[in-house]
Amino acid sequence: MTKFEELRTNAGLTITQLSIEARVSRATIEKIEKNQAVRAPLAARACTALSKHLGYQVTYQELGIKTVR
């Protein structure tokens, strides 16, 4: 389990809920959780949406999410 997935589940969010709030596809969230690279702006949106539920900011850099340009 990735740190991102752990935080998402601790926040009580499903993949679908987070993808809707972050305005990214379910596939993007699934890739992040499988430690596959995604575009940096999408990773940032996912982290911003997750941060709102956690009550503190997390970034894709600190979570080690792999990104491509």
Predicted segments, located by residue:
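Short, basic-rich loop-to-helix N-cap that marks the start of a DNA-contacting helix
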Residues: 35-48
